[in-house]
Amino acid sequence: MSAHPVDTVTAATATPDVAQPFKELGLKDDEYARIKEILGRRPTEAELAMYSVMWSEHCSYKSSKVHLRYFGETTTDEMRSSMLAGIGENAGVVDIGDGWAVTFKVESHNHPSYVEPYQGAATGVGGIVRDIMAMGARPIAVMDQLRFGAADAPDTRRVVDGVVRGVGGYGNSLGLPNIGGETVFDESYAGNPLVNALCAGTMRVEDLHLAFASGAGNKIILFGARTGLDGIGGVSVLASETFDGDESGTGRKKLPAVQVGDPFTEKVLIECCLELYAAKLVVGIQDLGGAGLSCATSELAAAGDGGMHINLEQVPMRATGMTAAEVLSSESQERMCAVVTPENVDAFMAVCKKWDVLATDIGEVTDGDRLTISWHGETVVDVPPRTVAHEGPVYERPVQRPASQDALVANTTAGLKRPESADELKATLLKMIASPALCSRKWITEQYDRYVRGNTVLAENADSGVIRVDEKTGRGIALATDASGRYTALDPYAGAQLALAEAFRNVAVTGATPKAVSNCLNFGSPEDPGVMWQFQQAVRGLADGCATLGIPVTGGNVSFYNQTGSTAILPTPVVAVLGVIDDVHRRIPTGLGLEPGETLILLGDTNDEFDGSIWSQVEHGHLGGVPPKVDLEREQLLADILLAASRDGLVSAAHDLSEGGLAQAVVEAALAGETGCRILLPDDADPFVTLFSESSGRVLVAVPRTEETRFTGMCTARNLPWVRIGVVDEGSDSVEVQGQFSVSLAELRTTFEGTLPALFG
């Protein structure tokens, strides 16, 4: 037991005037007053720790909640029809047919990944995997959305190296394929990298588990790793000023605020959980992530039909002398908390022993509506659990469109010099594909295992990852994640919809049907009215877009305070779209050359839209103007036609157009198929606009010559604009833009793939 004096409920009642460090714990005066009002006394040290972490921005969504409600307001019953679990659960769950369900979610681990890039990224992966486990599913794949400072900035190499190794090291050790993502470099992320991790899992519909504690007398079992001092960063006053000393030593002060992960413990924990689920030994379950036991106990109790009592000293600890507040606040990784009926406890413990997973009975569900926690026989917590988990402060922060927004929008690309000659067009292409903005991410993705477990059908560099779910029927899922901070800075409403449109389109080009959305909303300080305007507009854009497309937001995450001083990151709403494909054998690949002599057809309208584009960034260091127009009805039409084409075998390859426009799409598709092609520019077209415009709602498809008439006829009948844009010449080893220039595949590959190894290799 700690030598630290125990601040009990009795002591707190008897000493109402004791000064407490609530401000150091991040609580405001009115929040502290509200806690005292709820309890009818001052909180104990342990209670103060619980409320401070659970009422933090990260856990309570106190600045975003009023805006996030809009997702619910715009989601119809029809949109919810296939959703088995949604916002408020550990992760969203969608019925994908044939008795299968998929759960998926995106979470951020941004700030820890700057402080300690390897562990920050690794534990970000571990945390989202446990969210998926807690729903009753087997995790099957991960993805990542990464944002770093300028590629040539001094500190970027440190952060990139650690984050990429952390994502790969943890995911690879778990045996989970990393099937895609995005990596963006921009100076706004210097000091504030974004590490957003997605995990997806599968289960039979009847195996869904939720986080709740019900049934008086049911036992609370903590299982997994021991509880240590790592991750008590948010509760800084509970730990020390230094990182020195052994965790178990008497002179220890504080370990780093960043959690330390052990993927091998988590891998065993996954198998243990799945066996517990299969044996029907779990009533309710919650993973221990942010806020640790404070979160797990209060959320389980709040969601149940009674109260809960915890004997905190029973928690297995790996550090001596821990206080009750430290045990409650620890964010040690690889831990789960389950509710188990008394008659099943022995069987539960036996399964854990089989997998060599430490499991301890730490309490039970009680009658009543209180969460009580004792520490060596003395009560240190006695609270209504809903007040901790769900009834924290809710702020309607000031929302104000920044005065600088008008000037930003007015600063268009109209006056920027454009390439005109064939040589200038070729030089522009080579410069753009070599830029950190568009170059190959192969140096990153090769550090990830993309095909472990044998169910990966498509992965990076495809537009979306495709995973087989059912080996007998071939049923699978497609997942894509997208975001554009540049477009969102120009117009947050449109920027969020452009991210949604691209992720939706990336799923559709594989031949899958988009079904559901998750998100991770990364913004600056909520105390800045301009940031809150960006956030409000992005939420509304995303929600309205999902309503138009008829797919629900199943859950997500908000990350605020991503800024250095007064400089915020580019507003970055990350959107993940889940699609379902009936048979992964009919998925549409990215690479050209599958069929000899394919015709290249460009679907959609190409307009002179360069504001916010990668061309304006790479060639001119420019950001301003109005983003490309979003047409979500067109996106739905594209998806419908690609689905029909996939089922009928009308297209042999497809690749969406986004950053870098047609030129980037052609280069990527040609290199993926190791096949050259000729691009035939329309007679009346501006070569620069045709090659580099970033107009939305476009897809490049390769069509076998025998199916061209049938495919184009289908597009014409559905009023989808199309133009024959080129041919794939059998045996070609170059990309030729007819009448302009030609570049060999060898030069394209060297240029495209050489940048990141030169910077970070």
UniProtKB/Swiss-Prot annotation:
It is found in: Cytoplasm. Its EC number is 6.3.5.3. GO terms for cellular component: cytoplasm. Transmembrane segments: none annotated. It catalyses: N(2)-formyl-N(1)-(5-phospho-beta-D-ribosyl)glycinamide + L-glutamine + ATP + H2O = 2-formamido-N(1)-(5-O-phospho-beta-D-ribosyl)acetamidine + L-glutamate + ADP + phosphate + H(+). GO terms for biological process: 'de novo' IMP biosynthetic process. InterPro entries: PRibForGlyAmidine_synth_PurL, PurL_linker, PurM-like_C_dom, PurM-like_C_sf, PurM-like_N, PurM-like_N_sf. Mg(2+) 2 binds at D131, D287. Keywords: ATP-binding, Cytoplasm, Ligase, Magnesium, Metal-binding, Nucleotide-binding, Purine biosynthesis. GO terms for molecular function: ATP binding; magnesium ion binding; phosphoribosylformylglycinamidine synthase activity. Monomer. Part of the FGAM synthase complex composed of 1 PurL, 1 PurQ and 2 PurS subunits. NCBIfam families: FGAM_synth_II, PRK01213.1. Belongs to the FGAMS family. This is Phosphoribosylformylglycinamidine synthase subunit PurL. It comes from Rhodococcus opacus (strain B4).
